[in-house]
């Protein structure tokens, strides 16, 4: 039985980690940290996990990284905080899965430009998208868990850019549930403002844009012009991404579907739908990424749609999938559940 610590355990990703790990047979949560809630019972902040595993016995702790002695650490901290924590854990030889954006970029200047933070320096991290980097994840010590929007976007276009059958310009239109904004309420996420409403934000300047771009360029082995615009939906969970690209050659829809099925044939958590329409309820509370659409218009524009749960495949579920790969567990352990539909 391996032991786990969750640093920053009061937010939505920390909550989701606890819920999934409650059904994981190979690990036990030993520490959950929080500065502001130190000393409080875990189940006071997360009542939904009461009576599960050892959670009734746990209290939030205010631990320094040097005092953590578990096999695995999940950093569910805001951007910037991991820069002070991960290097210490890395030096100690502890396996780290970081859910922030702090170690997703090899180009530190790009990180600093988009996140507005001074980086403290590179460490040997691996970008934790299992469908692309599984072999590297197996040997990693620090795994940079992908962002929620990038997960759905990259997976939706990876087969096309890898096979070099679309032009360099790709556009992503994504719509996310409110939980993606985090546990702290804001003017934007306040119920009267988000209910029965839909609107875009950060039209051209969302920090996930370069993350999507760099990963697709890695697959394409060339420069791409990737554009991304997010929207906020009046729902709790889920990201629906509509991807647009232009085909380089005349290719039929059936051939496109075959390319996707071949690319993801060994990927349990990616489901390809030929005719069914993709929706959020199909993936809600699951670690699946559903991909469909594959429609081609008269101008050669192909439209691909993906759906994920932003808190699961877009965050905590993918982090646990990465842990499973890293530790040699069954990759599906704790995650073998379908979407909650309806």
Swiss-Prot record:
One of its GO terms (cellular component) is cytoplasm. The active site is at 148. Keywords: Amino-acid biosynthesis, Arginine biosynthesis, Cytoplasm, NADP, Oxidoreductase. SUPFAM superfamilies: Glyceraldehyde-3-phosphate dehydrogenase-like, C-terminal domain, NAD(P)-binding Rossmann-fold domains. InterPro entries: AGPR_AS, AGPR_type-1, NAD(P)-bd_dom_sf, NAGSA_dehydrogenase, Semialdehyde_DH_NAD-bd. Its EC number is 1.2.1.38. It is found in: Cytoplasm. Pathway: Amino-acid biosynthesis; L-arginine biosynthesis; N(2)-acetyl-L-ornithine from L-glutamate: step 3/4. GO terms for biological process: L-arginine biosynthetic process. GO terms for molecular function: N-acetyl-gamma-glutamyl-phosphate reductase activity; NAD binding; NADP+ binding. Gene3D superfamilies: Dihydrodipicolinate Reductase, domain 2 (3.30.360.10), NAD(P)-binding Rossmann-like Domain (3.40.50.720). It catalyses: N-acetyl-L-glutamate 5-semialdehyde + phosphate + NADP(+) = N-acetyl-L-glutamyl 5-phosphate + NADPH + H(+). NCBIfam families: argC (TIGR01850). Catalyzes the NADPH-dependent reduction of N-acetyl-5-glutamyl phosphate to yield N-acetyl-L-glutamate 5-semialdehyde. PANTHER family: N-ACETYL-GAMMA-GLUTAMYL-PHOSPHATE REDUCTASE, CHLOROPLASTIC-RELATED (PTHR32338:SF10), N-ACETYL-GAMMA-GLUTAMYL-PHOSPHATE REDUCTASE, CHLOROPLASTIC-RELATED-RELATED (PTHR32338). Belongs to the NAGSA dehydrogenase family. Type 1 subfamily. This is N-acetyl-gamma-glutamyl-phosphate reductase. It comes from Methanococcus vannielii (strain ATCC 35089 / DSM 1224 / JCM 13029 / OCM 148 / SB). The gene is argC.
């Amino acid at each position: 039985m391996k032991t786990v610590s969750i640093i920053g355990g009061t937010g939505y990703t920390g909550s989701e980690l606890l819920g999934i790990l409650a059904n994981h047979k190979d690990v036990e949560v030993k520490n959950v940290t929080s500065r502001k809630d130190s000393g409080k019972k875990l189940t006071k902040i997360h009542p939904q996990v009461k009576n599960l595993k050892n959670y009734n016995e746990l209290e939030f702790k205010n631990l320094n990284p040097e005092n953590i002695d578990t096999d695995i650490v999940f950093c569910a901290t805001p951007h910037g905080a991991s820069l002070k924590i991960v290097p210490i854990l890395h030096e100690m030889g502890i396996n780290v899965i970081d859910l922030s954006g702090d170690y997703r970029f090899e180009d530190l200047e790009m990180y600093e430009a988009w996140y507005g933070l001074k980086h403290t320096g590179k460490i040997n991290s691996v970008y934790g998208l299992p469908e692309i980097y599984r072999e590297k994840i197996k040997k990693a010590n620090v795994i940079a868990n992908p962002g929620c929007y990038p997960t759905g976007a990259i997976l939706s276009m990876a087969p096309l850019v890898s096979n070099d059958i679309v032009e360099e310009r790709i556009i992503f239109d994504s719509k996310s549930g409110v939980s993606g904004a985090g546990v702290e309420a804001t003017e934007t996420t306040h119920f009267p403002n988000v209910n029965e409403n839909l609107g875009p934000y950060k039209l051209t300047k969302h920090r996930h844009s370069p993350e999507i771009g760099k990963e697709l360029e890695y697959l394409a082995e060339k420069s791409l012009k990737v554009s991304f615009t997010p929207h906020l939906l009046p729902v709790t969970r889920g990201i629906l991404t509509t991807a647009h690209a232009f085909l380089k050659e005349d290719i039929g829809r059936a051939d496109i579907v075959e390319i996707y099925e071949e690319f993801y044939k060994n990927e349990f958590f990616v489901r390809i739908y030929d005719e069914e329409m993709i929706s959020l309820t199909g993936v809600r509370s699951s670690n699946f990424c559903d991909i469909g659409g594959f429609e081609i218009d008269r101008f050669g524009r192909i439209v691909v749609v993906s759906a994920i749960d932003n808190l699961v495949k877009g965050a905590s579920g993918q982090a646990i999938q990465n842990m499973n790969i890293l530790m040699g567990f069954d990759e599906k352990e704790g995650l073998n559940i379908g979407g909650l539909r309806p």
